[in-house]
Amino acid sequence: VFTENAKLAKLVYQASQEAKQQVSVFSLADEAIAKVNSAGENIDMDVVEQRTKALRIDDIYSIVYTSGTTGRPKGAVLTHRNAAGLPHNGVDWIPQVLRGEDVRLLLFLPLAHVYARFLQLLAIGGDGVVGHCANVKTLLPDLQSFHPTYLLCVPRVLEKVYNAADAKAGSGTKLKIFRWAAKVAITYSRALDEAGPSTSLKLAHRAADRLVYSTLRSMLGGNVRYVISGGGPLGERLGHFYRGVGMSVLEGYGLTETIGPATVNTAVQSKIGTVGPPVTGNSVRVTVDGDIEIKGIGVFAGYLNNDEANAEAFTADGWLRTGDIGSLDEDGYLRITGRRKELIITAGGKNVAPAILEDRLRGHPLVSQVVVVGDNQPFISALITLDADMLPQWLKNHGLEEMSVEQAAKNPEVLAALDRAVERTNEAVSRAESIRSFRVLTDDFTEANGLLTPSLKVKRAAALAKYADVVDSIYASKASSMPTD
């Protein structure tokens, strides 16, 4: 077993002792690779060749544990068929991204995330060079020195890049220019899907490129043409913004149980707002109730030592129940609504998909994370955390003095800005689905405190358990004045 540091190595060793299993534990902080290489110096190459030839395509490639956003993590058994077949098909699916002498990928998602591991396999099957960012704190200089041509990221990263650029513009003329350029990018991208941009729009786009887009591309290394996004939905507005800037975001959809994207938009035909059609070798169907099911080369063999979970995971005819709900359009492109388990049913019987509200609200520069709540309650509300990195610049841009997150959580101007953001968010849904109240938390959600997964998804069950008293206070204070929808 390989661990990141000595502390984890000690924990694994203690667990193996308690289980009475003989396990060799290596810490990467203690020359683990050198020790393994040394141990293998005297092994006959014939033995290595025999072991290699003994492998079969349906043998276990890796056991990857699910993120546990809604429950206890489970060990997903992935096979060599998954690890070889889907990346092989993926290279032919998006050759414009993966083929060419100058192709370069910089990975900054942790390899604990199955999507990052898949992209590494995909890149090896394609052309070019793969680089790894050792620390996200050095991501910007790493991007500028490595000059990647494509990236893998989660939507939250794209949201933060946009918000940082908006905040950096400051106020006054510079801010007006940035927001004008953003509007031009979005309009230009939408026009590409319709009759094409007009002459005046093309001229405005060229001007915006000189003033804004070229600088933004330079921040990311100057050569990024494509961004593969997964792990959650990206708002259509941001998708159009990035394409208008010159970096097409190819949204995909997959699970740990599918080793990588079961569906993904292509470089040739992308529908912003969808997660694309099934990758070759995979099939997707949607039941009459909207449940998404997958079958094909990427689907895992089952959960390790968990017959009960396996029975729940697969249909009688062998399709994987994803637990997500959505729809397929006439061209076979998949659109995600949300997780079935995360659907909120209000006291009035209204079904509410929290992801739609959370994704829109998280686009505000002050907001770090959002959890929408309201199950069995008379109305929908939200828990909001502030982005500590963005807060100082936002305060400066709005002529406010420096303050801590704790102070900002009670500040009238900050609360008023969040209230306006909630109002804009509510424009996307009906009144019964709208957020009527919110609370600002003083602690953010992180991996360290157990409220975020490595792909920056909120562990909803853990967050609701930790802040149950805050949720209770929302409904206690509003119960007498808020009608049930």
Regions found by a protein language model. Name each.
Residues 7-57, 165-213:
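ANL superfamily adenylate-forming
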Residues 43-65, 72, 98-104:
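Conserved pre-ATP/AMP-binding loop-to-beta segment of ANL
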Residues 369-372, 378, 419-485:
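Conserved C-terminal "lid"/linker of ANL adenylate-forming enzymes
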Residues 80, 234, 242-248, 255-273, ...:
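Active-site loops of AMP-binding adenylate-forming
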Residues 84-104, 111-213, 223, 248:
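Conserved AMP-binding/adenylation subdomain of ANL enzymes
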Residues 278-346, 363:
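Conserved ATP-binding/catalytic segment of the ANL
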Residues 299, 333-362, 391-411, 431-435, ...:
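Adenylate-forming
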Residues 61-87:
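Conserved AMP-binding A3 loop
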